[in-house]
């Protein structure tokens, strides 16, 4: 309901204006307090890169985090990732993921990143606690925080913001009147803006998601031969239509298209009963939640972010200069 108001012209949104004003006052005051030192955030001894957004919903942050980890690893860095672990309930916090960690414990994005990148990943409601654990481990020399642009209690050195190039900022209003967590003017203070699909704006870095060969959810086996005939598709992500459009662009004939909310806790009986016939395609993020009960004809589509070399050059330059990008000066966290 709200999402339809955010991304379409609707006079009904003005009914939410008082709540948006209240949100603006509270969030703006908090941001101002950290920026001017009235509230102190935790500053790590290691460089911290935040990958986030100013709007709610799926903008493509996780592929950017994976890309960043892989690029830094290839250049000799030892990155670690911290996350809030949304949707999970760990046995304790901070919680470092291991090979047996589940999405019920750590959330879906952290499990995906840990399995895909093989780097240390720690979750905690207070990201500073996760950062301290990584510092104490001595295993990392740079920290990437998955989401957390608005988590000003953790100081950062570089800020990357991912924008949905197709939907942009909707009606450009703050929550709940619109989809924005912070005003569009916040982008003036970040180090880089990444445009996921669509036409990038001035100064934005274009990003493209490149699909790989589908893999079986149950055991990661690559698809040996193209799937023929109709297939079903499910997506429990921030913007499911983007995934369905990707599948159609790859030539798949979709029968059922089932969209769930982001971080949806899948029920085995429901999915097995609903998708027991035709082959099923899902996102990698959904696959990490379904692996334990997946059927043999369930597949996920791995995607990787493709970004210009100039973005990496910019980041490496900032790190070489001590990791003090614009983001380090705009807020204590």
Swiss-Prot record:
UniProt key word Kinase: yes
Residues annotated to bind ATP: 55-62
GO molecular function, one term: ATP binding
GO terms for cellular component: plasma membrane
SUPFAM superfamilies (alphabetical): P-loop containing nucleoside triphosphate hydrolases (SSF52540)
Family to which this protein belongs: Belongs to the LpxK family.
HAMAP family (alphabetical): LpxK (MF_00409)
Function in brief: Transfers the gamma-phosphate of ATP to the 4'-position of a tetraacyldisaccharide 1-phosphate intermediate (termed DS-1-P) to form tetraacyldisaccharide 1,4'-bis-phosphate (lipid IVA).
Protein name in the entry: Tetraacyldisaccharide 4'-kinase
Organism for this UniProt entry: Aeromonas hydrophila subsp. hydrophila (strain ATCC 7966 / DSM 30187 / BCRC 13018 / CCUG 14551 / JCM 1027 / KCTC 2358 / NCIMB 9240 / NCTC 8049)
Gene: lpxK
């Amino acid at each position: 309901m709200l999402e339809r108001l955010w991304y379409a012209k609707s006079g009904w949104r003005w009914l939410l204006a008082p709540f948006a004003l209240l949100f603006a006052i509270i969030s703006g005051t908090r941001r101002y307090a950290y920026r001017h030192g009235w509230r102190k955030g935790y500053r790590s001894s290691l460089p911290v890169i935040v990958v986030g957004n100013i709007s709610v919903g799926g903008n493509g942050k996780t592929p950017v985090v994976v890309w960043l980890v892989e690029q830094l690893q290839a250049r000799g860095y030892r990155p670690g990732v911290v996350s809030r672990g949304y949707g999970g309930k760990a046995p304790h916090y901070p919680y470092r993921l291991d090979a047996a960690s589940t999405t019920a414990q750590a959330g879906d994005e952290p499990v995906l990143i840990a399995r895909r990148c093989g780097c240390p990943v720690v979750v905690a409601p207070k990201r500073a606690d996760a950062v301290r654990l990584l510092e104490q481990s001595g295993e990392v020399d740079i920290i990437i925080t998955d989401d957390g642009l608005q988590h000003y209690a953790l100081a950062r050195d570089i800020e990357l913001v991912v924008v949905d190039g197709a939907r942009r900022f909707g009606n450009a209003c703050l929550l709940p009147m619109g989809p924005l967590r912070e005003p569009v003017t916040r982008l003036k203070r970040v180090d880089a803006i990444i445009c996921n699909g669509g036409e990038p704006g001035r100064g934005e870095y274009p990003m493209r998601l490149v699909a790989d060969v589908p893999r079986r959810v149950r055991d990661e086996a690559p698809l040996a031969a193209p799937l023929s005939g109709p297939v079903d598709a499910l997506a429990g992500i921030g913007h499911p239509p983007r995934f369905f459009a990707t599948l159609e662009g790859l030539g798949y004939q979709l029968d059922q298209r089932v969209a769930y909310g982001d971080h949806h806790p899948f029920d085995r009986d429901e999915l097995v009963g609903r998708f027991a016939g035709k082959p099923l395609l899902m996102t990698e993020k959904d696959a990490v939640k379904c692996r334990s009960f997946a059927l043999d004809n369930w597949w996920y589509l791995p995607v990787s972010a493709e970004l210009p070399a100039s973005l990496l050059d910019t980041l490496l330059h900032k790190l070489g200069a001590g990791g003090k990008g614009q983001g380090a000066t705009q807020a204590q966290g």
